[in-house]
């Protein structure tokens, strides 16, 4: 199957916020955040796999993948001996996963790996409001977010999730930073 996810907010699920098992999938200018408050055994923000079906292409561009866990991305390669494809690329993204080793780096272009110890610019601090106690969330960007002005102007969508123009310096994720939003 062919799937295009653009300007989308996929957040706070008990299971994975986005799960891909094979296909030809592009995710662009989206926010995928796992801040589900009711179960410590919640799944990851993003799970992609070529285990059951060939992952012909998984491309994530100009997107944020974050959450409570130190690793919010799970990639499952096909079993040894399988002929299933497992093709993936991340570009101009901010992702909460440990930095990859040299043999994996070819799959990551202009990607920021979140520093889980940075409590100012990453994780829930990207966003205007993450209040698990009151179950109130606003995934628009805060002025401290590392996502501001970091998207690729050539590949980012021209408008954000709210229909606002992204301009010459688009932000990573589903929403453009708005000065008066906070």
Give the location of each predicted region:
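Predominantly extracellular beta-rich ligand-binding scaffolds that present long acidic/polar faces
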Residues: 2-138
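Surface beta-loop-beta hairpin patches that serve as ligand-binding interfaces in beta-rich domains
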Residues: 135-182
